[in-house]
Amino acid sequence: MQISLLLMQQIAQLFLILLMGYAVVKTGLLKASDSKVLSVVFVYLVMPCVVLNAFQIKDTPEIRTGLLYSMGIAVGMHVVFLLLNALFRKALKLDAVEQVNVIYSNAAALVIPIVQALLGEEYVVYSCAFVIVQLVLLWTHASACLQGSAQLEWRKLLTNVNLIAIAAGALLYLLHISLPAPITSTLSSVGNMIGPMGMLLAGMAIAEVPLKKVFCTPRNYLPVFLRLLGVPLVIVLLLWAVQASHWVPDGKSILMTVYLSAITPACATVTSMAQLYDRDASHSSAIYVLSTLLSILTMPLMIGLFELLL
């Protein structure tokens, strides 16, 4: 349970930063709309630096095996997500916004700083596997679901800066190209901002949402329960049933980096997509806010179960 306690401590630290972001808006120092500037820095500078730096590792058979393993697990998890969604959609009458919020997590922004703190910088590369799979599905399945059509956003997928950074990092890794020390130091320094900046943005976003409406609307709790507890519980039981942690050397730690991505709150990008496709963005925003706040309790709980079973 040590990892679970460390995770709780790390999430508590991130939550305090979230409160700072909330406070600067509520005190009138900034407007919630001012977060757009930080969002640009976060998406176009910080995240790519983290990804590029993650791939600056020695190419060994163990790492290659770990990458293939994490990618396979990530694909398998998303297949389960989609199957569960097909089941929940009809049984629970989930609308498109709720479905997409249940399937897609805020993995990129939240998991990477947690993995850095809990397991070390060398494990960040494995969390990229989940991000790759999610990005592909986000701009294909999720966009089609929100549009109510089969039209796919290939251009947005292929021009996504994080996917480009992953492709560039993977290419450098495969070609055994090590960047000069000043560059890797710069990437590391900028990348270290991912946790604080991500939570400041979350806090600023939460500040513009009426929390009374978020907490007092019963319907909000259904997709949040599925995202934080229902789906992660099914996933961890399946991983336990097939003993996935024993498939490769260091399997439990690598598996944890991928599982952490599956238990994070709803994806912030979904709310932006809901606005783009004229869906109920306020409902999506409420799910994001509620799931982000409740994940402080549920993530350590699910990791505790992961440690117990695997």
Task: Outline where the language-model segments fall.
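Alpha-helical transmembrane segments of multi-pass small-molecule/ion transporters
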Residues: 1-310
